[in-house]
């Protein structure tokens, strides 16, 4: 493996500036779910220029694509994302909340880094395949709409991963370690009520309030929370209250629900009960109700064999060396965080490493930027979050790591993260992830026994728990409204 590590390290460092430029350019063009046309084409055309064969409009999603190089088996996929979040515009390298354009988008989850690291890994693996004449195929999967859109779930449904043997990805974090926990499955759907408008004082008896129906539905689901499993979550947002005039009986209103639980069967059960509450609310108010299924994703299925192989590569490369300017800026960011933010970050570290992870987290209570790789241990912990990587993981072996791109304590989906996402701190973490994925991919090409063991582990689970795509066939991806 030492020769592989040297080759990958040299290959990625040789193009270091190119990769940081691409990450920054995507940061400069933040686009939300299923509207990432600039970002997708930027990556696709760059891969095309690098000698990859690019297929666009994959899975009937205009900004999803596959870039492929090589021939035959095995086929190893590197999963890239590039979507941003609404309302998180923020100036880069600034330790106070200062938007570039108020109310506009920002890369609050570091997906400008996520997609670029997978891009860099794919280029490095291509160079290795060319250098050594090794058989096999490396693919970059351009996956839009992770944030609230479950883009990969739609892609899985359309069969675009059917011939893939294994997949690797990563996520920007405040520490270096493995993403080795289960996640929550979810369903997101909206209920739109229609009633009859009327003068709220003169003729309220003639009106039928859609807003009342939404209020009754939210009240009912809040009572339902007492009667669902402990690890389930039911979130909602009233996306249309009917208007701003209280003297009108509101003729339309809408509420969006996100239902989560460790298993999709539990999510589906809760979803069915919420749907009945909606019907009851419509009945009580003499309104009509229409449900629009938005998206869903499955829980994440870890593959311990592949995780171990990826962890070996991550441990070899180790955490980046930070300079005094980076440490000083990270301290400024930490000064804006709460003690709860910091503790939550440490809890996330601890959750991935068993008992050693807890000791590791305690040791790093005062750490500014991660300076060692967190321990790895197979764990039954469930991360209280969701990812559409979950659906890929039920189709084939998947492993993913975390890489340090932010100050310890930085919460996801915040201005602090956006600010750090276009700095040398983020760039260093991104390139560590790229090297880790590339080296693990080469290892899979060379070690057929390793790949077979990964697939056997995967099959042992899916033989007894077969995968069913949670998104109905008639549902199509929808941009953020």
From Swiss-Prot:
Q: Keyword check for Hydrolase, yes or no.
A: yes
Q: What is this protein called?
A: p-aminobenzoyl-glutamate hydrolase subunit B
User: Which cofactors is this protein said to need?
Assistant: Mn(2+)
Enzyme Commission code: 3.5.1.-
In the induction comment, the record states: Could be transcriptionally regulated by AbgR.
GO annotations under biological process? folic acid catabolic process
* Organism the protein comes from: Escherichia coli (strain K12)
InterPro entries from the UniProt entry: Amidohydrolase (IPR017439), Aminobenzoyl-glu_utiliz_pB (IPR017145), Bact_exopeptidase_dim_dom (IPR036264), Peptidase_M20 (IPR002933), Peptidase_M20/M20A_hydrolases (IPR052030), Peptidase_M20_dimer (IPR011650)
**CDD domains associated with the record:** M20_Acy1L2_AbgB
Q: Is Translocase set as a keyword in this record?
A: no
**Function field:** Component of the p-aminobenzoyl-glutamate hydrolase multicomponent enzyme system which catalyzes the cleavage of p-aminobenzoyl-glutamate (PABA-GLU) to form p-aminobenzoate (PABA) and glutamate. AbgAB does not degrade dipeptides and the physiological role of abgABT should be clarified.
The gene designation is: abgB
**A Pfam family matched in the record:** Peptidase_M20
Matching entries from PANTHER family are given as: PEPTIDASE M20 (PTHR30575), XAA-ARG DIPEPTIDASE (PTHR30575:SF0)
Subunit description: Forms a heterodimer with AbgA.
- Keywords, comma-separated and alphabetical: Hydrolase
Instruction: Enumerate the GO terms in the molecular function aspect.
Output: dipeptidase activity; para-aminobenzoyl-glutamate hydrolase activity; protein heterodimerization activity
Q: Which GO terms describe its cellular component?
A: catalytic complex; cytoplasm
């Amino acid at each position: 493996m030492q020769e592989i590590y040297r080759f990958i390290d040299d290959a990625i460092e040789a193009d270091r500036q190119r990769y940081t430029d691409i990450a920054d350019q995507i940061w400069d063009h933040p686009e939300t779910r299923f509207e990432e046309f600039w970002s997708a084409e930027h990556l696709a055309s760059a891969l095309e220029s690098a000698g990859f064969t690019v297929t666009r409009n994959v899975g009937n999603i205009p900004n999803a694509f596959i870039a492929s190089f090589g021939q035959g088996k095995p086929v190893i996929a590197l999963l890239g994302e590039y979507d941003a979040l609404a309302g998180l515009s923020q100036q880069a390298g600034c330790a106070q909340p200062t938007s570039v354009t108020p109310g506009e988008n920002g890369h609050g989850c570091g997906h400008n880094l996520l997609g670029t690291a997978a891009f860099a890994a794919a280029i490095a693996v291509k160079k290795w395949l060319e250098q050594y004449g090794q058989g096999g195929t490396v693919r970059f999967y351009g996956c839009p709409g992770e944030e609230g859109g479950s883009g990969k779930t739609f892609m899985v449904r359309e069969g675009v991963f059917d011939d893939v043997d294994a997949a690797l990805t990563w996520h920007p974090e405040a520490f270096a370690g493995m993403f080795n926990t289960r996640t929550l499955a979810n369903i997101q759907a909206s209920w739109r009520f229609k009633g009859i408008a009327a003068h709220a004082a003169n003729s309220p008896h003639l009106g039928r309030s859609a807003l009342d129906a939404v209020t009754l539905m939210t009240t009912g689901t809040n009572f339902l929370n007492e009667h669902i499993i402990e690890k389930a979550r039911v979130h909602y947002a009233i996306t249309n209250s009917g208007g701003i005039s209280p003297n009108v009986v509101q003729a339309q209103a809408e509420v969006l629900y996100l239902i989560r639980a460790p298993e999709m069967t539990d999510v589906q059960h809760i979803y069915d009960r919420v749907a009945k509450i909606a019907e009851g609310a419509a009945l009580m108010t003499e309104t009509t109700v229409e449900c629009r299924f938005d998206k869903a994703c499955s829980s994440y299925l870890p593959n311990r064999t592949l995780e171990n192989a990826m962890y070996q590569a991550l441990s070899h490369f180790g955490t980046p060396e930070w300079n005094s300017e980076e440490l000083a800026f990270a301290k400024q960011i930490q000064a804006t965080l709460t003690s709860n933010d910091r503790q939550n970050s440490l809890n996330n570290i601890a959750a991935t490493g068993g008992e050693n992870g807890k000791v590791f987290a305690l040791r790093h209570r005062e750490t500014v930027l991660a300076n060692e790789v967190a321990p790895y241990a197979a764990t039954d912990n469930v991360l209280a979050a969701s990812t559409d990587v979950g659906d890929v993981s039920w189709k084939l072996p998947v492993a993913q790591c975390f890489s340090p791109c932010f100050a310890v304590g930085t919460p996801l989906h915040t201005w602090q993260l956006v600010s750090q996402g276009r700095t040398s701190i983020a760039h260093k973490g991104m390139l560590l992830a790229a090297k880790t994925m590339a080296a693990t991919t080469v290892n899979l090409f060379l070690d057929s026994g390793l790949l077979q063991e990964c697939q056997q582990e995967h099959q042992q689970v899916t033989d007894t728990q077969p995968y069913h795509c949670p998104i109905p066939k008639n549902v199509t991806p929808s941009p953020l409204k």
